[in-house]
Amino acid sequence: MQLKRVAEAKLPTPWGDFLMIGFEEIATKHDHLALVYGDITSKEPVLARVHSECLTGDALFSLRCDCGFQLAAALSSIAEERRGLLLYHRQEGRNIGLLNKIRAYALQDQGSDTVKANHQLGFAADERDFTLCADMFKVLGVYSIRLLTNNPQKVDILTQAGINVAERIPLIVGRNPENARYLDTKAAKMGHLLHDRYK
C-alpha cells in the first residue's frame, strides 16, 4: 500500500452527512481524502467518483473547466443513492501543481489548448497517478465500483490495479462557452467520452 488511513470526521454538506477520511502517502506525506456516504461494506458494486483536485473549479467557481460541476453532481448522485464514496485525489492540475496550472492557463489564453500547454511546460498531458486511488479503495475494503467518469484511462488503471469497475457512468455536466474548447480537446486528444452528449 502506498498510503495509510490517518483520520476521520463527519462532514455535513448540502447533500447530507458524509464521513471524511484522510489518507497520507507513506513515501511523500501528501494527503488525500475519501468522502463516504452510507454503508459501503456490502459486496454489491459501490457508486464511486475519483475526483482530482481542482482549486479553481472546486473552490473558486471557475468556468474554464467542468471540475466544480462534476464534484457537485457526483456528491449529489452518491447522496441520492444513499451509498457511495468520492475519492478526492489531491493531484492539482493533472498533477502539475497549482502554479504550473496557472502558467498553463496563461498559455491557453495565448492560443494553446490544454494538452499543448502542458507539453510547452515540459509535462505530459496527464501526470496523475491513479494507482493511489486503487489503494484508497482497498484500504476502505471496496473492490467493486460503479465509476462516475468520462475518462476511460481511469477505468483501465483501476482495473489493472485490482479494482473491478462493474459499470462506467458518464458524468457530463457544466459545459459553457468558457470551457467548450477545453472539453473538446479532452475528447479529441485524451480520449474522454464526451461527444455523445454534446454533438
Swiss-Prot record:
InterPro entries: GTP_cyclohydro_II, RibA, RibA-like_sf. It catalyses: GTP + 4 H2O = 2,5-diamino-6-hydroxy-4-(5-phosphoribosylamino)-pyrimidine + formate + 2 phosphate + 3 H(+). The active site is at 126 (proton acceptor), 128 (nucleophile). Its cofactor is Zn(2+). Keywords: GTP-binding, Hydrolase, Metal-binding, Nucleotide-binding, Riboflavin biosynthesis, Zinc. Its EC number is 3.5.4.25. GO terms for molecular function: GTP binding; GTP cyclohydrolase II activity; zinc ion binding. GO terms for biological process: riboflavin biosynthetic process. Belongs to the GTP cyclohydrolase II family. This is GTP cyclohydrolase-2. It comes from Baumannia cicadellinicola subsp. Homalodisca coagulata.
